[in-house]
């Protein structure tokens, strides 16, 4: 288990984890996990977030290749965990995931937040539930193991860099419900990437305009 000395904390903000434990329990009293706090901590397998945490920065757990279990302590006002996802409460959005994440199909989760799975290179499969309306900026940025994605008819927006540098991504089904795709959504993806779209849809036009192969279904 982790030791308090392994954490660099300033005024309740967890700046950086400096330990080498495979099971990490963030100390109670931490109110924010700053951007890059656990970046490249490749040995961590599980993380427990205390109920005192009110904010989690972008890329906080990026490139944690061994991370397979994420838990938020019960009683947290801002976040909850389910299916190894951290979910922002209220209008529910997934803000953090790992290679073992299963996005809940409860019907309450409306989006995948900015950089939620960024740097999750070991993620090779993800099911997007039919309640999801948007993919935030960099939602799957750097998910180099992801090979195929099917977006449900509920999705309307794909954010900037949502699938940037997903080097193994070869197919993605995008429904006609999607009305906005960022120009940089697929930057750095394989030349073999095929977007599967409806004929005469916005997505078909997007693929052709951006030099991406398109298959009509």
What residues fall within each predicted segment?
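Consensus positions within tandem repeat domains that build extended binding/scaffold surfaces
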Residues: 35-37, 58-60, 114-116, 136-141, ...
